[in-house]
From Swiss-Prot:
Protein family per UniProt: Belongs to the big defensin family.
Entry coiled-coil feature ranges: none
GO biological process terms, semicolon-separated: defense response to fungus; defense response to Gram-negative bacterium; defense response to Gram-positive bacterium; killing of cells of another organism
Cited Pfam families: Defensin_big (PF14862)
Disulfide bonds, paired cysteine numbers: C82-C112, C89-C107, C93-C113
Domain of life: Eukaryota
Keyword presence, Kinase: no
Signal peptide from the UniProt entry: 1-23
Organism whose genome encodes this protein: Branchiostoma belcheri
Main location (coarse class): secreted
Subcellular compartments: Secreted
Keyword terms, alphabetized: Antibiotic, Antimicrobial, Cleavage on pair of basic residues, Defensin, Disulfide bond, Fungicide, Secreted, Signal
Record's protein name: Big defensin
GO cellular component, one term: extracellular region
Length: 117
């Protein structure tokens, strides 16, 4: 009989605080919704000149205020510097250059051409 009593007490100890806690949670006031934190423009685009396609993507993703604060400018075409001014966006690379596929996404329809060292 002592075993049943111990089990009953154990279940009472486990269940009673849960029901009391549930009653307290129901009476708690609802929390205010938090404002969405705006996303920051990635550092690779700060102060950069990007293609029109990348410019539109930045505007849609981060908003005009964030893009203006990051000093991102749009170029009239896809021919501009890439890879932190170590390469140039071109439709065809010269013979002394190679295509840097890692940084080509900022070039739009062109490839990021970097010199071979």
């Amino acid at each position: 009989m002592e075993k049943k009593t111990a089990y009953c007490l154990l279940f009472l100890v486990l269940l009673v605080p849960y029901t009391a806690l549930g009653a307290v949670l129901k009476r708690a006031p609802a929390k205010k919704e938090k404002r969405a934190v705006p996303l920051a423009v990635p550092l690779v685009y700060w102060g950069a000149s990007v293609s029109p396609a990348v410019w539109n993507w930045l505007l849609v993703t981060f908003g005009a205020a964030a893009v203006a604060a990051a000093a991102v400018t749009v170029s009239d075409n896809d021919s501009h510097s890439c890879a932190n001014n170590r390469g140039w966006c071109r439709s065809r690379c010269f013979s002394h250059e190679y295509i840097d596929s890692w940084h080509s996404d900022v070039c739009g329809s062109y490839d990021c051409c970097r010199p071979r060292y």
